[in-house]
Amino acid sequence: MTKQDYMDEAEQVLFHVYNRFPVVFDHGEGVYLYDTDGKDYLDFASGIGVMAFGYGNRDYNDALTKQIGKILHTSNLYYHPPLVEAGKKLTRVSQMDKAFFTNSGAEAIEGAIKVAKKYAYLRDGHAGHEVIAMEHSFHGRTVGALSVTGTDHYREPFYPLMDGVKFATFNDLDSVKQQVTTATCAILLEPLQGEGGIYPATKEFLEGLRQLCDEKDILLIFDEIQCGMGRTGAMYTWQHYGVKPDIMTTAKALGGGVPVGAFLVTNRVAEASLVPGDHGTTYGGNPFVCAAVSKSIDLMEELQLPEHVQQVTPYFEEALAQLTKEYEFILGTAAWASCKDF
């Protein structure tokens, strides 16, 4: 089949919800993708932040092949070694206490919201609690995740969304405080806004949120789906600030290309929120994806990817600054690890 044949047949059988580029990729190796004609492309997108250690890594491929030969899937009603190993490694590098594996970042957000609502339900003895999210944020495309996404053009066609959501101005503590009521159960934000324009939270803002949440018994949720897994020079962005959340979500590079996400909580939250029957998943945390998570974390550490980000940041800052001088339409630049408020 020719490239055009693939594209034509795709339009016949696939729901047209992506404006795809006219290229058909066949395989990848290192930082390059190769199309069906053999042409190579330097992959600056990394599969939208997923392929942190590139394509065709032999250790990663061997680990997944080995797991396929053992067992791909079993119910979450049973234990299996890859689940335990992945959980141990993820809680260690995230500095959180308990993990729940999901199939995507959006599912992780949904789970985080449920944890916060159940925590408040047990605390107050009734439902009807609210979440404060940030303007210009992005948390996913499921109805719940979209409800806490502060970008109107994503939300508007799907009203009414989940109620009990208020929006505050990012990096404006007073704006958040104005939205807090006795019904507030959580404050949700990205420590480094991605879709909103690569905007880092200030240290003062995160410290103020932490203090506010502690005073009001509100749970602080950090969405690290896009900015986590080494992209800012630490495994998770909040670790730069030293402001620990009560709940954290992660995905993207977590599985090295395999669909997986997770939400993590502190022991305090785990002991006062979800119980058996409150939440679950068929595929989340199965042996195959957990083998991928475990090997991805291993490679992150073996290849010292967070440290590498720190090393190459000055080069990118200089190169990006030069582009602003050469092209008038570039108003400014931002890099994941060049945020000076840490």
What residues fall within each predicted segment?
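Conserved N-terminal phosphate-binding loop of PLP-dependent enzymes in the Aspartate aminotransferase
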Residues: 1-342
